[in-house]
């Protein structure tokens, strides 16, 4: 049986004594890969969690820790470090209390993601159709700076949705459709970071 502590200790021997520069980050990724290649299942997640925390500690000298954690929550940063740093740099500059409030309202509303498709025929309020149209304009084929700007631009439609629409409608189909709409919106936030950690 492979012992997790032994695996991690062996992998840490691959790390340089100094944590300065990109060498540490690359060796950290290598150490994690060394461990993961020898195990499977749940223990793999535990190993990645350990090394992701090491990465966050290292990078917290340069970036806010909550931003690092938010950007690591939905995508494993060790899989694509370049992408991770790009997202961290953009989210670290975020200065939109209204966007944060809306994103967290969506996250609080969704105890779990809906697995249903949004059905336009079930819309009862104009704000529902408006929000869907706005969500559909958000493109991932842009820089993260531009992506964040898109989220900020659609936020008035998110606010109007919450002002005009009672999500938990007494009609179960209408309620489920609204939760599906919010799940779609949540996926747009999650592409960048877990806003609940900001």
List each model region and its residues.
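Amphipathic alpha-helical "coupling" segments that flank catalytic cores
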Residues: 1-198
């Amino acid at each position: 049986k492979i012992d997790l502590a032994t695996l991690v200790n062996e992998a840490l021997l691959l790390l340089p004594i100094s944590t300065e520069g990109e060498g540490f980050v690359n060796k950290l990724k290598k150490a994690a890969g060394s461990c993961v290649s020898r195990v499977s299942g749940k223990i793999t997640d535990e190993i990645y969690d350990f090394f992701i925390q090491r990465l966050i500690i290292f990078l917290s000298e340069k970036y806010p820790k909550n931003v690092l954690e938010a950007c690591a929550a939905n995508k494993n940063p060790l899989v694509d470090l370049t992408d991770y740093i790009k997202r961290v740099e953009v989210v670290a500059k975020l200065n939109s209390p209204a966007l944060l409030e809306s994103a967290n309202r969506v996250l609080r509303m969704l105890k779990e993601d809906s697995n249903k498709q949004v059905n336009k025929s079930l819309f009862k309020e104009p704000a529902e159709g408006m929000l869907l149209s706005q969500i559909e304009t958000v493109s991932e084929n842009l820089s993260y700076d531009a992506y964040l700007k898109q989220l900020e631009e659609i936020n008035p439609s998110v606010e109007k949705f919450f002002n005009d629409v009672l999500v938990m409608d007494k009609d179960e189909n209408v309620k489920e459709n609204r939760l599906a709409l919010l799940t779609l919106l949540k996926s747009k936030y999650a592409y960048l970071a877990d806003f609940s950690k900001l």
